[in-house]
A protein has these predicted regions:
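Eukaryotic phosphotyrosine signaling hubs
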Residues: 6-8, 72-74
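Short hydrophobic/aromatic beta-strand micro-patches
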Residues: 10-12, 76-80
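Short beta-strand micro-motifs in enzyme catalytic cores
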Residues: 46-48, 73, 105-109
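Vicinal oxygen chelate
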Residues: 2, 8, 86-125
Length: 125
């Protein structure tokens, strides 16, 4: 059987600059500007991106929405300290869906971006 792996998450957002600032300040993702000079509805044009190459490769991008922004997606980020991560999210004006609480896998808080996507911050125990 083929080894299929998730390698990219791409969200279309209503305001790229504001979203880049939120993901940086609230969630610690240092997105870098990118510009793919291709005529492709999904991957062409200006955007912001970050890739993790240690362990399994994963790429995350924000693109300006060409029609409706992506919504209803949940991504989860592992953090070392949920309380300080929560404080950073609140300080950056992320909308708190629920404050850090005990879950089966550790402590998690959930937040929404400007387009309604959910960002879970989790400290695994």
């Amino acid at each position: 059987m083929a080894d299929h792996r998730l390698v990219a998450v791409i969200l279309e957002v209503s305001d790229l600059d504001s979203s880049v600032a939120l993901y940086r300040d609230a969630f610690g993702l240092d997105l870098h500007p990118g510009n793919n000079a291709v005529d492709d509805r999904w991957t062409g044009g200006s955007h912001a991106e970050i890739s993790w190459t240690e362990g399994a490769y994963l790429h995350f991008s924000l693109y300006p929405a060409k029609e409706q922004p992506t919504s209803g997606v949940q991504i989860s980020l592992s953090v070392d300290n949920i309380e300080s991560a929560h404080a950073a999210a609140v300080s950056a004006c992320a909308r708190v869906l629920h404050e850090p609480r005990n879950e089966l896998w550790g402590r998690s808080g959930r937040y929404a971006d400007f387009d309604g996507n959910v960002i879970e911050l989790t400290q695994h125990t």
